[in-house]
């Protein structure tokens, strides 16, 4: 399973990339706004750090505007993936961009049928939001299982990006289900590396080393 980092914070991206576990990056307008920088500048800098798919989201709500934005974004770097909302206009734009050979990531997916529509429209990636579903007492990981089954049944090549990840258990379940990608906040990536027994073991080794004659 591939790990994308879900952030527009260049410092976090750089640090996670140095761990050797980051295969790509997902951003959205909210994450870009937190950076306080120009959209294009942030995307350009990220593209220079991670050699993998970089999802950059359009903000237009209608087809022609989405296409216009997408054509400008892909000029920034060959690794740019256009992030589109799961709406009828977003599906139209997905079809158009797919025909042009431009990679797409259909986002804000909350049902298996939305994922199926996106795959049929030619999406490169689909992004179901598990955490937001959990927040309203629905089974976020359950829809990942259903999407995986549907795509496998019919041979759809769209990759499943598990998004809105809130904790390490979401990552574990994504891997067990067979999702293609988990896009993970920096804080959760760091949690994945931690275990109290690891820390205790290191502490014990160092204490014992101090007893070794020098």
From Swiss-Prot:
Q: Active site: which residues?
A: 83
EC number per UniProt = 2.2.1.2
**Bilayer-spanning residue ranges:** none
Q: Which residues form the signal peptide?
A: none
Pathway stated in the Swiss-Prot or TrEMBL entry: Carbohydrate degradation; pentose phosphate pathway; D-glyceraldehyde 3-phosphate and beta-D-fructose 6-phosphate from D-ribose 5-phosphate and D-xylulose 5-phosphate (non-oxidative stage): step 2/3
Quickly give the catalysed reaction: D-sedoheptulose 7-phosphate + D-glyceraldehyde 3-phosphate = D-erythrose 4-phosphate + beta-D-fructose 6-phosphate
Q: Which UniProt key words apply to this protein?
A: Cytoplasm, Pentose shunt, Schiff base, Transferase
Instruction: Please tell me whether the keyword Transferase is annotated for this protein.
Output: yes
Per UniProt, subcellular location reads as:
Cytoplasm
Q: Which leading EC class covers this enzyme?
A: transferase
- Gene Ontology biological-process annotations: carbohydrate metabolic process; pentose-phosphate shunt
Query: Which GO molecular function annotations are given, in alphabetical order?
Result: aldehyde-lyase activity; transaldolase activity
Q: Please state which protein family the record places this protein in.
A: Belongs to the transaldolase family. Type 3B subfamily.
Q: What does this protein do?
A: Transaldolase is important for the balance of metabolites in the pentose-phosphate pathway.
Q: What is this protein called?
A: Probable transaldolase
Species: Geotalea daltonii (strain DSM 22248 / JCM 15807 / FRC-32) (Geobacter daltonii)
Q: Which gene is this protein's source? A: tal
